């Protein structure tokens, strides 16, 4: 075996020292991210400037009017409403089965609200990823309308220790408190539907769909046994919740499916964004030690990190690990589906990535519409170009790689054609 050059040993030792933070230290607080020390450049920061003169007036509005204002301003549809009755939130003391927390979402923002409490907002920053804010009616000038919240990070940094979204399924008791010692789990793409939505209200779901939603109990068997799962159907939330306090009286199952999908993809995008920025930040020092020219393309561990994140992005975008739908499919009340389709981008054949299937899977063409999102567009150019080039290669390959094997040839062809026509700024490596 040939000897290892001294410069590689020195470089490895240097990087090891740089990457050895204290056990409770978050890497995203260091350059180039510097999460807490950096002022976000997101939509909420700009809205604070616009609403500065109205902040006190808006705080005095009735709660539902404030919620409507936030939703309309952030272009988040009220029809996306979900209701969570478990006390797993910053405002846990206000939440109960009779007073659930409402969640709303779009491709670019997430909004949470509990009657009697503040409005929680998550949006995305080009460098920081997920950023968290609170609109509190009790605040007074000179506080801005939207206040950045560091408390959210106590729970919202669980996805590879980056600021992220979180969707949990737990075993709630009659008061919405998670049962002691019962555990719970994050909802991932592969999570079976029988294990999802513990602590959530689920409306519009077919009787064939077994899940943990709508159920309160005293032991795990109350949720997972046939009796518990079969009692999960709720014909009308008005029997439990004073629904007139909320924009809608539903927590639609299709909106839940979409929320699960988007939370996962947004988390993968945010992690890829931060990890690749860190790798690219370290690349000049590595390049200098290796004696490479300034225009040298990323190599070594930097390239390995970019390759790894590109693979994860492709897996998430193509719904590689999607749990199988129950026989007969999943149908909701149709309200969310109609609103979701309004922003579809169609190709010349009328096909769109926002077309839903709901028979055997979520999307008719299994490539996430979040590929059009600002978050994906904000990825470092090196990573975005690499991801899209790999995506086009896999979609066009006669013998597709493993990440594409779940997609039939006709579906791969359709996805490629849709993206070629509808996705802006395709890289030179995109195969046409």
Give residue ranges: language-model regions.
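Sequence context surrounding c-type heme c attachment/ligation sites in exported
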Residues: 111-297, 301-304, 310-318, 360-432
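N-terminal alpha-helical interaction blocks
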Residues: 24-116
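Acidic, glycine-enriched catalytic cores built around paired aspartates
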Residues: 316, 329-359, 375-376
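Boundary at the C-terminal end of the N-terminal hydrophobic targeting segment
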Residues: 20-22
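N-terminal secretory signal peptides that target proteins for export/translocation
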Residues: 1-4
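Bacterial N-terminal signal peptides
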Residues: 7-17
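Surface-exposed patches in mature extracellular/periplasmic domains of secreted proteins
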Residues: 78-86, 323-331, 399-410, 427-431
